[in-house]
């Protein structure tokens, strides 16, 4: 797993593919 670079609601955003994410309304959205 890869930490995408943002923490949302104190939880690191984790994805299975490289990339970045944004935190909106305490939910991680992945590009």
Swiss-Prot record:
<feature type="disulfide bond">
    <location>
        <begin position="4"/>
        <end position="21"/>
    </location>
</feature>
<comment type="similarity">
    <text>Belongs to the cyclotide family. Bracelet subfamily.</text>
</comment>
<feature type="disulfide bond">
    <location>
        <begin position="13"/>
        <end position="28"/>
    </location>
</feature>
<comment type="function">
    <text>Probably participates in a plant defense mechanism.</text>
</comment>
<keyword id="KW-0611">Plant defense</keyword>
<protein>
    <recommendedName>
        <fullName>Cycloviolacin-O25</fullName>
    </recommendedName>
</protein>
<dbReference type="Pfam" id="PF03784">
    <property type="entry name" value="Cyclotide"/>
</dbReference>
<dbReference type="InterPro" id="IPR005535">
    <property type="entry name" value="Cyclotide"/>
</dbReference>
<keyword id="KW-1015">Disulfide bond</keyword>
<dbReference type="GO" id="GO:0006952">
    <property type="term" value="P:defense response"/>
</dbReference>
<feature type="cross-link" description="Cyclopeptide (Asp-Asn)">
    <location>
        <begin position="1"/>
        <end position="31"/>
    </location>
</feature>
<dbReference type="InterPro" id="IPR036146">
    <property type="entry name" value="Cyclotide_sf"/>
</dbReference>
<feature type="disulfide bond">
    <location>
        <begin position="8"/>
        <end position="23"/>
    </location>
</feature>
<keyword id="KW-0960">Knottin</keyword>
């Amino acid at each position: 797993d890869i930490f995408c670079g943002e923490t949302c609601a104190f939880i690191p955003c984790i994805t299975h593919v490289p990339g970045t994410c944004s935190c909106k309304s305490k939910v991680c959205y992945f590009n």
